Amino acid sequence: MTESTPAVSAPAGGERHASWLELFFDLTAVAGVAQLAHLLHGSPGWDDVALYAVMFLAFWTGWMLFTVYGNVSGDEVRTWTVLAGMFGMAVMAASVHGVREDRAGAFALAYILVRALAGKAWERRGEYVPELPITQLGLGLTPWVVSMWFDGTERYALWALGLLIDLTVMFSVSGTALAARVDARYARKAREAGPGRRAAAKPAAALMDAPHLGERLGLFQLIVLGEAVAQVVAAASQAEWDAALYAVGAGSFLLLLLLWSLSLRHGADGVPLLVWDVLPVRLVLPPHCFVAGAVAALAAGLGDAVEYTHHPVPGPVRWLLCGSLGVYLAVAGVAALCSGRGVPGTLLLVGPSLAVVLVTGAAARQAEGAHLVWLLVAAAAWTRLVVERRRPGRRGRPAQAAA
C-alpha cells in the first residue's frame, strides 16, 4: 500500500480463501442486492435512483465492515458476532420493499445496530484498522440516529448526509493520520488518569490480509453480476420467445460477460482497470461500492429491457441502463488513471465508450430493447478490446488471477 502506516500484509502460512462462515455471511449480500434492485424496476424517477443509491451504499457499508472484521480476525473471528451482523443485514434487506411506507425506521435502526456491533467487535479485539477510519470516526452515524425522529424526504436526506460524512472520512483521513489521532487521544487519556491510575489500553493497529480482501471484494462483484443474470432470466421466462427476445438475451449475457472480464480479469479488488497495490485500501473501497451499485442498477434495467422487445424502451429505463454503464465506465477511467495509464491512454480506453453511452441515452428514443442493449455491448466491448491490446504487466491481485 502507499500509506506509510502498514495496512496490509500477506498471510504467513500461505494464501487464505473465503471461509464457510464468510460465504454464509455473503448470502445476506445476495438477498440485499436482489431487494435493492427492485427499487429501480418499472420507470424509476430521479427520487427512486437517489433512494437506491443511499440504501445501496448503506447496505454495502454494513457488508464491508464485517468483511474487514473477518479478514483481520482470521481464525479468531467470533462466529456469533458475524451471525448477529448477518441478521441485522437481513433485516435491512427485508425492509427495502416497504421503505416508502412503514419500514424506513426498521432499515435505519438495523443499520445503526450493525454499525454499533461492528464497532464493538473492534473494541473487544483491542484493535483498529488504519485503512478503515470510519471504525474510529463515527460522526457519520449521528444523522442516522437523528433520522429516527423524521419521516419521508427529511429522513432520506439525513441518511445521505451520514453516508457523505463517511465517504469524506474515507477519502480524507489516511492511515497515518488516523494512527496519529489514536495516539493523541490515548496520550490525553493517560494524562487525565493522573499518576498511580491505570489509563485505558491503546488499541493496536490491525493489519489486513491483502489477497484475501481482494478475493472477498471480487466475490461481492460476482454476487452483483449473478443478480443481473437472475433478473434477465426471470424476465425472459415470462416473455414470448422470439428473435427479438433472443437478441436481448444474448446481448445482455455478452454485456455482463464483458463487465466480468473488465472487473475481475483486468482489474483489482473488483474495480475495473485498477492495478494491484497502487491505492490504499481506504481509497479502493468507495469505487468498489460505486461499481457494484452501478452493476446492480444495470441488472434492474436489463430485466426491464426484456419487456420492450417490440416497443421503444421508455426514457427512464433507457437512462437507467445508460447511466449505470456510464458510472461503471467513469469509475474504470479513474482507476485507469490511478494505475498509471496516463490521460491519453485512459481517454482511449473509456472515452469512446462513454460517448456511445451518453449519445445513446440522449438520442436513442425509439430504440427497442435489442437495439439498446447491443449499443451498450459495443460500448463495453471497445474498452475490453483496447485493454487487451494495451495490457500492462500486472493486471490484478494474485487472489483474482483465476477469476
Question: Can you describe what each PLM-predicted range is?
Answer:
Residues T2-S19, L23, T28, G32, ...:
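Predominantly late transmembrane helices and immediately cytosolic-facing juxtamembrane segments
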Residues L27-D47:
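Transmembrane helix-boundary motif of multi-pass solute transporters/channels
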Residues V359-A370:
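Membrane-helix boundary connector in multi-pass membrane proteins
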Residues A50:
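Short catalytic helix/loop segments, enriched in acidic residues and glycine
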Residues V373-W374:
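Signature aromatic-anchored transmembrane alpha helix within multi-pass, membrane-resident enzymes
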